[in-house]
């Protein structure tokens, strides 16, 4: 089978390409010799099958022999001294003279270790070392000065391409940068005019699969002098010590994938060299060198290029970080202000949205939503609220990370396709996934055209026998693709800023919760003291008031004949005032007792309660002619029957009292809304209440009318009703149209 053919008899799976074991090909390129030794005794275990051509010795003459069969004693001693180094990279290359075919040949020897084996790779060196050193030292020094004088990554990339071409003499030199999906783009290029330009073209991640990128991360430089080479096998194919293929990950002679060779041939490239550019120990890009004819680059020149790549990686990282510095400072400033706003306000949501800058400015989003405790607040351009709620539900079930960022939401969440105008990009920050508390940032779709070097979607071809063959594309002509459903990508520091905001929110919310808990403790203590004071004060005041009231009556009865009319009137006023004060004190005493008496909870039929109240009020009902409407049976609830009876009594009595209509009516019922508790109501067509008084009416002794109107009263009834309802874990509120009537609603929860 020809090693350039890879046939796939079944369904094409591009992941197979990424699984090709390119680090253990069992083959090398023919421009050098590979020796595998047992380091402890320098016994030769494996050799490349071209030793006779280069070293004048057949493989069988070398296998299982000591390295002294090739090297003189002085050279062996030097090698042993060098092997004391932990990292052999610092000693490379060693220069050894070896006799081959009755001729002494100088070799560059490149050493490295692999799985406790010593690997020596020999390349013939015919150059003038002294002349080469000074020449390339000058070139590299000049290149570094030029690179240090650049201001942006674009400038440094162009200078880098120019200088590498000057040092190596390759026809074309490009700087190729990876994006987050490992697609590559040519961002700088130097070439002769007759060659087609690749500048600005994009190449799919499949062109340089994952395992190839891993090797680029381990080795700074890779040379292919002639793509038409015949690979040289390693003899024996497996290492005799462990019967495993030899790991050539760090080998400079390692044979490359047949797919890569075909890729080069399809591009019209015969020789190539790649130099890695790293940032934060991650592959950032490549310096890609192409030549139309075979081209061998000596090791010292490759070393100069490798050094240039390493220095460029440092410069590139610094330049790129510098380009983002101003933006990062701005983000930090926005973050600090948001924290200040949240610390100063009780509601952190309003703090994030209502000020300038707000959460949009933190990540340069066009819209944002804060979803917290079932409520959502938005700012900017956002999806409709129902779509946000569905998205939050999907997030809570499918995304388990604290932060999720994508510039193509529809890729993972197909329903987002209809939201492309506002939500093609998303950062979702989970405050509490279980409670579905999120902050969402949105970016709209940005339709753009990507220029590809050939069609990136055609990795296969059908050959004559009908088989499907995985093959690099044959055309690298400009191929345009319109990219939809993608937003402007999020920068890493923007995502990090959102994540830092989460920590700030949690810290502030916890702080506010602690402060609120302390306030609640103080409030509870104050309420208990106030209840105790009200109870004692009302109890102690009743006795003197009763005395004043009684003695006023005694004066009227015993001395009424001798008291003149003005005196009698003043005495009657005193009796009325003391009676009213006694009524107020009774109400206060009753109100204070509500908080001191335990609830007597039991299953209670509210129909019985309401009918008992109506019987008690029957006289007033007949007197006023009010119509009582009960449209449905009321449920059985778990409550304190006496206290809930008092709630209905107060509400029904008020509906009778505050009604000036000729045809009066009162409706009593409830609204069933599972799984929520039922909502009870008392509705009338009375005088109504202005909206500004909806809260006021529940304050103790707060009346909206003078005591002489609508039959008087203490103004404590609704306050007592509110306290009873709240002790049952419910709430009470009013809806009313002034002049038309009111509806009082209340809920109860099992306590």
Curated annotation (Swiss-Prot):
- Physiological role: Photoreceptor which exists in two forms that are reversibly interconvertible by light: the R form that absorbs maximally in the red region of the spectrum and the FR form that absorbs maximally in the far-red region.
Domain GAF: where? 152-320
- Annotated spans, Chromophore binding domain: 22-511
EC number(s) from the headed UniProt entry: 2.7.13.3
Q: How is it modified after translation?
A: Contains one covalently linked tetrapyrrole chromophore.
Locate the Histidine kinase domain: which residues?
536-751
Q: What is this protein called?
A: Cyanobacterial phytochrome B
Q: Which organism is it from?
A: Nostoc sp. (strain PCC 7120 / SAG 25.82 / UTEX 2576)
Task: Give residues annotated as binding a tetrapyrrole.
Answer: 17
SMART domains to which the protein is assigned, alphabetical: GAF, HATPase_c, HisKA
Any idea which residues bear Phosphohistidine here?
A: 539
> What is catalysed by this protein?
ATP + protein L-histidine = ADP + protein N-phospho-L-histidine
Q: What keywords were assigned to this record?
A: ATP-binding, Chromophore, Kinase, Nucleotide-binding, Phosphoprotein, Photoreceptor protein, Receptor, Sensory transduction, Transcription, Transcription regulation, Transferase
- Gene3D superfamilies reported for this sequence: 1.10.287.130, 3.30.450.270, 3.30.450.40, Histidine kinase-like ATPase, C-terminal domain (3.30.565.10), PAS domain (3.30.450.20)
One GO biological process term: regulation of DNA-templated transcription
Family according to the record? In the N-terminal section; belongs to the phytochrome family.
């Amino acid at each position: 089978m020809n090693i350039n053919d890879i046939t796939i008899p079944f369904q094409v799976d591009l992941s197979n390409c990424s699984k090709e074991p390119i680090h253990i090909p069992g083959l090398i390129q023919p421009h050098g010799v590979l020796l595998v030794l047992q380091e402890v005794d320098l016994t030769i275990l494996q050799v490349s099958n071209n030793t006779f051509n280069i070293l004048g010795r057949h493989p069988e003459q070398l296998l299982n022999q000591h390295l002294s069969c090739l090297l003189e004693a002085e050279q062996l001693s030097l090698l042993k001294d060098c092997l004391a180094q932990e990292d052999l990279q610092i000693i490379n290359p060693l220069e050894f003279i070896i006799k081959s075919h009755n001729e002494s040949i100088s070799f560059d020897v490149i050493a490295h270790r692999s799985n406790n084996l010593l690997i020596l790779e020999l390349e013939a060196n015919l150059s003038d070392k002294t002349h080469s050193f000074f020449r390339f030292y000058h070139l590299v020094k000049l290149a570094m000065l030029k690179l240090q004088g650049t201001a942006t990554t674009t400038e440094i990339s162009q200078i880098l391409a120019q200088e590498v071409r000057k040092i190596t003499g390759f026809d074309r030199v490009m700087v190729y940068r990876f994006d987050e999906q490992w697609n590559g783009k040519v961002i700088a290029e130097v070439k002769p005019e007759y060659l087609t330009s690749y500048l600005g073209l994009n190449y799919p991640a499949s062109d340089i699969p994952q395992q190839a990128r891993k090797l680029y991360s381990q080795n700074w430089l890779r040379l292919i002098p002639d793509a038409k080479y015949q690979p040289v096998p390693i003899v024996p194919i497996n290492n005799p010590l462990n019967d495993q293929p030899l790991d050539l990950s760090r080998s400079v002679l390692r044979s490359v994938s047949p797919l890569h060779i075909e890729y080069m041939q399809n591009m019209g490239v015969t020789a190539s060299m790649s130099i890695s550019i790293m940032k934060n120990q991650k592959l950032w890009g490549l310096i890609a060198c192409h030549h139309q004819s075979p081209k061998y680059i000596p090791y010292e020149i490759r070393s100069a290029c490798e050094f240039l790549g390493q220095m460029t990686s440092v410069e590139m990282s610094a330049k790129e970080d510098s380009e983002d510095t101003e933006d990062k400072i701005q983000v930090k400033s926005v973050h600090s202000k948001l924290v200040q706003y949240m610390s100063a306000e009780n509601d952190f949501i309003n703090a994030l949205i209502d000020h300038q800058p707000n959460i949009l400015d933190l990540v340069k989003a066009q819209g944002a939503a804060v979803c917290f405790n079932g409520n959502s607040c938005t700012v900017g351009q956002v999806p409709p609220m129902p779509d946000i709620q569905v998205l939050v539900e999907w997030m809570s079930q499918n995304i388990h990370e604290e932060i999720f960022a994508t510039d193509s939401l529809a890729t993972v969440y197909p329903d987002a396709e209809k939201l492309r105008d506002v939500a093609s990009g998303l950062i979702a920050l989970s405050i509490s996934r279980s409670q579905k508390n999120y902050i969402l940032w949105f970016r709209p779709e940005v339709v753009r055209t990507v220029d590809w070097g050939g069609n990136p979607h055609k990795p296969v071809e059908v050959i004559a026998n009908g088989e499907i063959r995985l093959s690099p594309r044959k055309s690298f002509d400009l191929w345009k693709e319109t990219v939809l459903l993608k937003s402007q990508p999020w920068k890493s520091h923007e995502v990090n800023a959102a994540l830092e905001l989460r920590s700030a929110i949690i810290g502030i919310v916890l702080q506010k919760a602690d402060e609120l808990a302390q306030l609640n403790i103080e409030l509870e203590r104050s309420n208990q003291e106030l209840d105790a004071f009200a109870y004692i004060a009302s109890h102690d005041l009743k006795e003197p008031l009763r005395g004043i009231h009684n003695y006023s009556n005694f004066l009227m009865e015993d001395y009424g004949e001798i008291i003149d009319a003005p005196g009698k009137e003043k005495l009657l006023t005193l009796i009325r005032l003391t009676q009213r004060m006694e009524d107020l004190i009774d109400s206060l005493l009753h109100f204070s007792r509500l908080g001191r008496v335990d609830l007597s909870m039991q299953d209670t039929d509210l129909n019985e309660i309401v009918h008992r109240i109506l019987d008690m009020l029957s006289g007033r009902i007949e007197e006023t002619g009010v119509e009582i409407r009960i449209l449905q049976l009321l449920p059985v609830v778990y409550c304190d029957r006496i206290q809930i009876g008092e709630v209905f009594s107060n509400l029904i009595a008020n509906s009778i009292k505050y009604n000036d209509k000729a045809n009066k009516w009162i409706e009593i019922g409830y609204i069933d809304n599972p799984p929520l508790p039922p909502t009870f109501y008392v509705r009338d067509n009375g005088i109504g209440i202005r909206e500004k008084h909806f809260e006021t009416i529940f304050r103790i002794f707060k009346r909206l009318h003078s005591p002489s109107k609508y039959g008087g009263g203490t103004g404590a009834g609704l306050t007592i009703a509110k306290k009873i309802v709240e002790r049952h874990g419910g709430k009470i509120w009013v809806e009313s149209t002034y002049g038309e009537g009111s509806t009082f609603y209340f809920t109860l929860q099992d306590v």
